[in-house]
Amino acid sequence: MDFPRFLLSAYLLLLSFAQCQHYYLLRPIPSDTLPLLELKEDPDPIYDPREKDLNETELRSALGDFDSRFLSVGPPQDRYAGNEDLDEQELQLNLAGMMPKDIKNLDFDAPWGKKRKASKKLKRRLQMWLWSYSFCPVLYAWNDLGSRFWPRFVRAGSCYTKRSCSVPEGMVCKPAKSTHITLLRWRCVARRGALKCAWIPVQYPIITECKCSCAN
């Protein structure tokens, strides 16, 4: 098969792959609200925990499970978790996980009719090309939430957004799955003229998977 035919076949497949399902416009996607909006805190230092409130032994006991993959008490040596600074070509070379079913199950014989069928080698080549183009990696970086959270450093995920993930352009990488980790938050409430403060557990969402989806 000559190269122009290969490009035509790939383009037709991408056109079908990039079609936005109509129900995406009717049904909200739960993870669209990730990541969290920027937290707004009162800047008055009276609401900050004091040194005696930051006993690590007591806080670890109150927190329970401490997942060091996503949590750090002190500033991590490597603020970026390995893939934030990678360029587009390097990201595409680091395909991870299982090949998406919608790419794996594409009918590569349709553009050629019943008499001619694409070879296994060509099918694999097209699958890998489509996968690398529509690949949506999760980029992890450490965020400092401030002294009113413990641990204050969280490894948060975001989706790659430097280019569209479809041809024609229009689809973008968006959060598809997430998990939650438990943090402690310093909460102060005014009661009877006095300020009462304590550490309370809160759930913080972490993006774990991104997917090529409709922009709207």
From Swiss-Prot:
Q: Name one GO cellular component term.
A: synapse
Can you tell me which residues are glycosylated? Answer: N55
Q: Which family does it belong to?
A: Belongs to the noggin family.
Function, as annotated, reads: Inhibitor of bone morphogenetic proteins (BMP) signaling. May play an important role in the dorsoventral patterning of the embryo.
Q: How does it assemble?
A: Homodimer; disulfide-linked.
Q: Which keywords annotate this record?
A: Chondrogenesis, Developmental protein, Differentiation, Disulfide bond, Glycoprotein, Secreted, Signal
What PANTHER family does UniProt report for this protein, alphabetically? Answer: BONE MORPHOGENETIC PROTEIN INHIBITOR, NOGGIN, NOGGIN
Report the main location listed first in the record: secreted
InterPro entries attached here?
Cystine-knot_cytokine (IPR029034), Noggin (IPR008717)
Entry protein name: Noggin-1
| GO BP terms | cartilage development; dorsal/ventral pattern formation; negative regulation of BMP signaling pathway; negative regulation of endodermal cell fate specification; osteoblast differentiation
